[in-house]
């Protein structure tokens, strides 16, 4: 029985932003890890993604979806899906971790390129454990570490572009040393725009107290990829007041579907539509862990809502 993602749009339509393409990711189905008993099997995720009306998908944690290029292409292709990019965690500030980082980034870049995609979303490791919230690294980088970060990011970006034709898109993240707007700007100001771009994650920018619209206006030429996400202002207040880690914040429901949170998706779409670039805009609503029947209806409602903001998903639904 096919999955039907049709429903009435929650808001009126507006002019479609022709330079933007909407997709989604395993994250929006509660997937954070390659393997976890609380996560959906990948075939159900792909079925529901297609059924919800999305055409583009990000690969998510390496090993969740098949890593054999032919198997992955078959699984994606038979559902009418396209790969927008890969996702990888890697260390930038510890030179002794470079070999380990370049190994996993290369694997993800190779798989990503095999599917015709051009972006690898790069997330530095968090300084808190995602499950326990325990702090396990420095929370801020000093000047020497920033110098290492810039050099390492440029080196990885250049190597991945030359070997696989992909661009590294740095993803600011909660509980990461690149989280606040000043930290994001410091990273961008010290890296090579030919090889390193920004994955603008609207929710994580808001989580870190940043201004998405300001970043788009001042660093628009560095934005190569987008995660669109909303955060609950009340949970953000709890994060600040109680010193919560991101894992606990997600359990409390910090990531919400539009239009419940910040930033306003319509404002983001309007600003992105002015950029001289074609951008993939991937829905990421962190839900880990969640009941298996929770993600699909949220994904349908989110696609409909964002379509009303001018973000087309490509796949037509009745």
Label the predicted regions.
Residues 293-315:
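C-terminal helical cap(s) of enzyme catalytic domains, especially alpha/beta-barrels
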Residues 24, 56-57, 151-262, 311-317:
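Acidic/histidine-rich catalytic cores of soluble enzymes
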Residues 10-41:
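Boundary/entry segment of secreted carbohydrate-active catalytic domains
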Residues 33-38, 56-71, 91-103, 174-180, ...:
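Acidic-and-aromatic substrate-binding clefts and catalytic sites of carbohydrate-active enzymes
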Residues 24, 49, 57, 76, ...:
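Conserved, mostly hydrophobic/aromatic
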Residues 3-11, 97-198, 278:
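Active-site acidic/histidine proton-transfer and metal-coordination neighborhood
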Residues 12-19, 46-51, 65-85, 103-117, ...:
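Acidic (Asp/Glu)-rich catalytic clusters
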Residues 36-41, 126-136, 235-248:
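Short, flexible, mixed-charge acidic loops at enzyme active sites
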